[in-house]
């Protein structure tokens, strides 16, 4: 939705340009400005919606997702998330989980493999020019990135093609389920930010990168005196409606 030309994408079909903002309103204004002036990536229509942030709109139906990250999440973060979902339910939102609908269970079961599919897609696409960087000066490449480059070296074209086909299936499954709700709601991370310079786990963000859906992380919870995010995810090109829902969720949980 936002043009990446002028920057460097390690994996062409997986990377995206995101907005870090002090408010969801500022996020929307900046994203629309970028899309209107630079467009989306070549061949893509860019971000749909008005220049001004959409008004807050209560989401009637929310699908709560555990995703691949739930088993890595600490108990305090799980409790904070469940408490926030309870508040949304008390406010009148209909809440659905994998226990309520076989289609949600099927979606959860499939996207539980997001780490594997993410690695197959990302590692294969990042091989060039990463191979050259590795050959030129391997000592300057961080250990995690170096391991990723080496993992990509073992992937075959057949494996990449299979991963592309699986992504098409994920996108179809996501579109069908997203039509039945106003937003999907997982955590943003397995816990609060780690101490030090480690960027932490991105396991809760992998599915949105694979599918290409809009996702907004809302810092509406606190664990260990640190912010913890709740994501809301929606249909592809449904950014404006998702932003309206996000404004309402933020206002409801932060009041």
Question: What kind of feature is each model-predicted range?
Answer:
Residues 15-22, 150-155, 232-233:
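Short, well-ordered beta-strand elements within core beta-sheets of diverse protein domains
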Residues 144, 155-255:
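Glycine-rich, small-residue loops and helix-cap segments
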Residues 142-150:
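Structural motif of enzymes handling amino- and sulfur-group chemistry
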Residues 108-129:
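Charged, often glycine-rich, active-site loop that binds/positions anionic groups
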Residues 76-99, 131-136, 160-181:
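Acyltransferase
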Residues 93-114, 149-150, 220-222, 227:
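Short connector loops at secondary-structure junctions
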Residues 1-83, 254-255:
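A short helix-breaking turn/cap at a secondary-structure junction
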Residues 19-25, 32-40, 86-94, 135, ...:
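Generic secondary-structure signature for well-ordered alpha-helical cores
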């Amino acid at each position: 939705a936002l043009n990446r030309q002028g920057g460097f994408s390690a994996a062409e079909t997986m990377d995206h340009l995101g907005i870090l903002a002090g408010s969801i309103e500022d996020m929307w204004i900046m994203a629309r400005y970028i899309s209107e002036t630079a467009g989306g990536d070549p061949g893509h229509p860019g971000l749909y919606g008005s220049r001004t942030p959409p008004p807050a709109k209560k989401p009637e139906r929310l699908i709560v997702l555990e995703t691949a990250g739930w088993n890595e999440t600490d108990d305090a973060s799980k409790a904070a998330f469940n408490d926030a979902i309870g508040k949304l339910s008390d406010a009148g939102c209909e809440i659905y989980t994998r226990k309520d609908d076989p289609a949600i269970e099927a979606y959860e079961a499939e996207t539980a493999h997001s780490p594997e599919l993410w690695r197959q897609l990302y590692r294969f696409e990042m091989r060039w020019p990463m191979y050259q960087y590795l050959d030129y000066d391997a000592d300057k490449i961080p250990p995690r990135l170096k391991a990723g480059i080496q993992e990509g070296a073992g992937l075959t074209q057949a494996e990449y093609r299979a991963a592309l086909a699986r992504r098409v299936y994920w996108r179809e499954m996501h579109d069908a389920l997203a039509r039945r709700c106003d937003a999907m709601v997982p955590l943003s991370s397995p816990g609060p930010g780690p101490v030090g310079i480690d960027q932490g786990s991105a396991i809760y963000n992998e599915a949105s990168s694979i599918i290409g859906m809009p996702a907004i992380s809302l810092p509406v919870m606190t664990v260990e005196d640190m912010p913890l995010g709740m994501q809301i995810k929606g249909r592809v090109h449904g950014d404006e409606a998702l932003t309206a829902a996000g404004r309402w969720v933020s206002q409801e949980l932060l009041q």
